[in-house]
Amino acid sequence: MSDKPIDIQYDKQATPNLSGVITPPTNETGNDSVREKLSKLVGDAMSNNPYFAAGGGLMILGTGLAVARSGIIKASRVLYRQMIVDLEIQSKDKSYAWFLTWMAKHPQRVSRHLSVRTNYIQHDNGSVSTKFSLVPGPGNHWIRYKGAFILIKRERSAKMIDIANGSPFETVTLTTLYRDKHLFDDILNEAKDIALKTTEGKTVIYTSFGPEWRKFGQPKAKRMLPSVILDSGIKEGILDDVYDFMKNGKWYSDRGIPYRRGYLLYGPPGSGKTSFIQALAGELDYNICILNLSENNLTDDRLNHLMNNMPERSILLLEDIDAAFNKRSQTGEQGFHSSVTFSGLLNALDGVTSSEETITFMTTNHPEKLDAAIMRPGRIDYKVFVGNATPYQVEKMFMKFYPGETDICKKFVNSVKELDITVSTAQLQGLFVMNKDAPHDALKMVSSLRNANHIF
């Protein structure tokens, strides 16, 4: 065997013949084939099955409608906010009753559900008549006001109750175009004017009811100040002091002094204390808030709340202030439930919760029974004695009832002096009322004044 190496030559460009080699199939070709078959099968099913096609169409249609509905709702809300305006009036607001009265008088309203309001009207001669007003009840109502349509919706809550009067809370909502929102002011001003006309020239008396002030009876005709005859200088002195107080609010504020003024009228019963306060309220065009400290279930907290939430332009009247706490202690065992303390009254008069710009009048027949704490300045700033009739008052009262009867007046005054007794102005008025147009008969009956309990 030769050791000479064998030299093998090959062509680098030659391609090997692999025809005899078996190559395994790849997966890609098979997967593509399966997908094509499934796609064809599903496509045929969707195109050939009418139920499937209809369901898909409905789904697409429903989705489109839902999107459209959502868009419409959002667009309508935006449009509502831009074009519509609402005004809500709650039943606890003063304007609520005013608005219902205005609605009752409005001629151009469309209402199918009505409620009735009953009003008592007291005439100057003392007679009382009844007037019924039909107002819109709960529900929707349309009115046309100054060319604009207004929707009025009155709602009554079934779950919320006003504990003060036991009635459900109510709201009235007025809806109109935004461009007409100025009509709300016009409506409220008209309603206010109608309400104020019922009290024009009259004095409104308020009394406490639960935690709030309520009108007591019908507004009373104003009593003229000249109709109350006190001793010389008393009436004028109080009136000057009140006017001075009312015009110096800034002076009080600049000096950090509470803007309050307290008056005490003391003297025997029937001397004209309460009558003067009524006449003063008429002179000032003020109302009167009467607070009975002996009221059942009155507490210190309620007292503070009432005195801090008085109606505007009102005089606070505390009558028989000396008897309030005595009565409570004397009748406590018999079921009297007032729990106002003396310190509670003092805090209500001058505490941090007391109202500013307050005129308070207190009356008493026994000033000696009052505690010194209540007599201090800041609680009582002006004290005046209102006593029985003096010769000055007897003369003035006689001439008021019998103008021009000067000679008989002198005889009457002298006859009263000769009785050597104290006579109240209430007794004199009773005598004069009994003899309205008969001054001579009044003179003859002077002796009846000896009996203070005489009924004319």
UniProtKB/Swiss-Prot annotation:
Single GO cellular component term: mitochondrion
Recorded GO MF terms: ATP binding; ATP hydrolysis activity; ATPase-coupled transmembrane transporter activity; protein transmembrane transporter activity
Domain of life per record: Eukaryota
Major subcellular location class: mitochondrion
Chain positions of motif Mitochondrial-targeting signal: 69-83
Topology versus the membrane: Single-pass membrane protein
Topology, Mitochondrial intermembrane side: 1-44
Subcellular location: Mitochondrion inner membrane
Pfam families xrefs: AAA, AAA_lid_BCS1, BCS1_N
Keywords: ATP-binding, Hydrolase, Membrane, Mitochondrion, Mitochondrion inner membrane, Nucleotide-binding, Transmembrane, Transmembrane helix
Catalytic activity, as annotated: ATP + H2O = ADP + phosphate + H(+)
Record InterPro entries: AAA+_ATPase, ATPase_AAA_core, ATPase_AAA_CS, BCS1_N, Mitochondrial_chaperone_BCS1, P-loop_NTPase
Mitochondrial matrix compartment residues: 69-456
Residues spanning the membrane: 45-68
EC number(s) reported in the record: 3.6.1.-
Binding, ATP: 267-274
BP term (GO), one: protein insertion into mitochondrial inner membrane from matrix
Effect of residue 273 to A: Abolished ATPase activity; impaired assembly of the mitochondrial respiratory chain complex III
Described purpose of this protein according to its UniProt entry: Chaperone necessary for the incorporation of Rieske iron-sulfur protein RIP1 into the mitochondrial respiratory chain complex III.
UniProt record similarity statement: Belongs to the AAA ATPase family. BCS1 subfamily.
Other remarks in the entry: Present with 1990 molecules/cell in log phase SD medium.
Name of the protein in its database record: Mitochondrial chaperone BCS1
Lineage: Eukaryota, Fungi, Dikarya, Ascomycota, Saccharomycotina
